[in-house]
């Protein structure tokens, strides 16, 4: 139940960030809803397609689409106050990342896949919504450039899978992973942590 509630909060927050990205590209209402939907539930859809997990999450639960579309339209109305809520969105985004990662890993495990595929599914669920958002908005995805985002998703998934072998209470496993991933993400933001950046400037290749 806790994970489901946090998931709904997560897709709402991600939908709003997607709507803002669409607004920066001066898209109409339809475009705003599409970008918001891709951001919020795109990662889970990519995961389900790769794993052959059908029906897709939003097909099985169409209320997710309604929640996301409503959040997108609401964002166009309250956009002027959004800059004042930046810290709130950072917190919600951190929670959403870990929740998406946990759900992605569990879907793969429930299908009988091993730890490696479960981690891949977790990272796909956690980051690919943002990747789709940035690609649709003609930007190099932020997750590929500077932020320690996919790394937090990866570490959270590894911890979640590992804890299941040592802790019998699944709620404890979920909460422990949430706490770890949440604070790891906020610490990465605070200290501006990121992976090494590769730069190649030779024009002949």
UniProtKB/Swiss-Prot annotation:
Main localization (coarse): membrane
One of the Pfam families matching this protein, by short name: Gly_transporter
Sequence intervals crossing the membrane: 30-50, 65-85, 88-108, 112-132, 148-168, 169-189
Periplasmic side: 51-64, 109-111
Cytoplasmic side: 1-29, 86-87, 133-147, 190-205
Subcellular location as annotated: Cell inner membrane
Record's GO cellular component terms: plasma membrane
Membrane topology: Multi-pass membrane protein
Keywords of this entry: Cell inner membrane, Cell membrane, Membrane, Transmembrane, Transmembrane helix
InterPro entries: Gly_transporter
Family: Belongs to the UPF0126 family.
The protein's name in its UniProt record: UPF0126 inner membrane protein YicG
Source organism of this protein record: Escherichia coli (strain K12)
């Amino acid at each position: 139940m806790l994970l489901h509630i946090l998931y709904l909060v997560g897709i709402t927050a991600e939908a709003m960030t997607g709507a803002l990205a669409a607004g920066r590209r001066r898209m109409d209402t339809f475009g705003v809803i599409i970008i918001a939907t891709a951001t919020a539930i795109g990662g889970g859809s990519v995961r389900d397609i790769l794993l052959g997990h059908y029906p897709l999450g939003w097909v099985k639960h169409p209320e997710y689409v309604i929640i996301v579309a409503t959040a997108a339209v609401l964002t166009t109305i309250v956009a002027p106050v959004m800059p004042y809520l930046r810290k709130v969105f950072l917190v919600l985004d951190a929670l959403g990342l870990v929740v998406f990662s946990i759900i992605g890993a569990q879907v793969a495990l429930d299908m009988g896949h091993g730890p490696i595929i479960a981690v891949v599914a977790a990272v796909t669920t956690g980051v690919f919504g943002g990747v789709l958002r940035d690609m649709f908005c003609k930007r190099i995805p932020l997750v590929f450039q500077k932020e320690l985002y996919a790394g937090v998703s990866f570490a959270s998934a590894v911890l979640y899978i590992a804890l299941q072998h040592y802790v019998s209470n699944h709620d404890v496993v979920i909460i422990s992973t949430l706490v770890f991933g949440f604070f790891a993400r906020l610490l990465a933001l605070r200290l501006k942590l990121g992976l090494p950046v590769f730069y190649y400037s030779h024009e002949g290749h």
